[in-house]
Amino acid sequence: MSGALDVLQMKEEDVLKFLAAGTHLGGTNLDFQMEQYIYKRKSDGIYIINLKRTWEKLLLAARAIVAIENPADVSVISSRNTGQRAVLKFAAATGATPIAGRFTPGTFTNQIQAAFREPRLLVVTDPRADHQPLTEASYVNLPTIALCNTDSPLRYVDIAIPCNNKGAHSVGLMWWMLAREVRRMRGTISREHPWEVMPDLYFYRDPEEIEKEEQAAAEKAVTKEEFQGEWTAPAPEFTAAQPEVADWSEGVQVPSVPIQQFPTEDWSAQPATEDWSAAPTAQATEWVGATTEWS
């Protein structure tokens, strides 16, 4: 399929990406039309997809997309959550028209509704989940491309790309590979240099996980600010004026403070001490008119 050209052969880094994302892992069921894409069956019943056939079909699909003069005439669809982000990224990279989420019945056949469109090529993520657009495409003679698993029905599918269309990483990687090949065949990017866009941007992420990561990052930032605030607080400034000493051999002149003078008393001039042995002087106290004499 690649025409035996070295430039179109699958590179080692591409194989490693396929294996890391689990693109070669199919399901436990096998459709009779998908037998030609199977390499072997594991002991646990899972079918292994031949990545060489996957790469050949990927190049064929990219050539079909490039053959459309107006990129907006290519409709890419994914009703499943795992492929919606990848479809939007693919559309942004290639100029295609994305339909992420529920497909409105009659989009390709009912001319009355506002969402009516007439694309020239249709690309779907899962033939089983996206059966409605495939059926309508058959009514209007619309060529179709689909990412097919081992148990996917190939009815109304013109170009089937065998891969794992269940895993989020596998679906994102396949759309990334397809977008890269389309841009390469159009001459937008070079085959000699790697594409600067990472496959991670095409992967589906659970909104709950994203919210948890944002909360954890916010808490970590607050903790870091508090920690830095405790240790980086400015030291108190002492504004007391220090005496300037030009010559350190000379002593610092301490300002003299006058000593307060207190009057001194002559203890010798005090009167003689009373005789404590004498009886105290009688004092009269009135307690209910009575007097007490101390004798």
Curated annotation (Swiss-Prot):
[DE]-W-[ST] repeats lie at residues 230-232, 247-249, 266-268, 275-277, 293-295. The modification N6-acetyllysine is found at K52, K89. GO terms for cellular component: cytoplasm; cytosolic small ribosomal subunit; nucleus; plasma membrane. Residues 266-295 are annotated as: Disordered. SUPFAM superfamilies: Ribosomal protein S2. Residues 161-180, 205-229, 242-295 are annotated as: Laminin-binding. CDD domains: RPS2. It comes from the Eukaryota. There is a cross-link at K89 (Glycyl lysine isopeptide (Lys-Gly) (interchain with G-Cter in SUMO2)). This protein appears to have acquired a second function as a laminin receptor specifically in the vertebrate lineage. It is thought that in vertebrates 37/67 kDa laminin receptor acquired a dual function during evolution. It developed from the ribosomal protein SA, playing an essential role in the protein biosynthesis lacking any laminin binding activity, to a cell surface receptor with laminin binding activity. Belongs to the universal ribosomal protein uS2 family. This is Small ribosomal subunit protein uS2. It comes from Cricetulus griseus (Chinese hamster).
